[in-house]
């Protein structure tokens, strides 16, 4: 049987956990086997910028940071389960990728 690998990525870990819970509920309702969610390493993007717009004065810096959290879920590729997966309401800041594997 084919497996669907669901990759979730977003900046808010609470949103990711909510979607992971919905995927597990769908798997329980349809009776398919699910493994995960597996938390993947968090990527940290840092951008340093000068506070002074003209370059004069002391060299003071601001550091901006964005953390990208990722989760991985493997689910059996049942037609009903995949149809319900496509209907999940996903927030705009969460990226979902579904890949079918043998």
Curated annotation (Swiss-Prot):
Pfam families: Ribosomal_S10. GO terms for cellular component: cytosolic small ribosomal subunit. Keywords: Ribonucleoprotein, Ribosomal protein. Involved in the binding of tRNA to the ribosomes. Residues 34-58 are annotated as: Disordered. This is Small ribosomal subunit protein uS10. Part of the 30S ribosomal subunit. Transmembrane segments: none annotated. GO terms for biological process: translation. Gene3D superfamilies: Ribosomal protein S10 domain. One of its GO terms (molecular function) is tRNA binding. It comes from Halobacterium salinarum (strain ATCC 700922 / JCM 11081 / NRC-1) (Halobacterium halobium). PROSITE patterns: RIBOSOMAL_S10 (PS00361). Belongs to the universal ribosomal protein uS10 family. InterPro entries: Ribosomal_uS10, Ribosomal_uS10_CS, Ribosomal_uS10_dom, Ribosomal_uS10_dom_sf, Ribosomal_uS10_euk/arc.
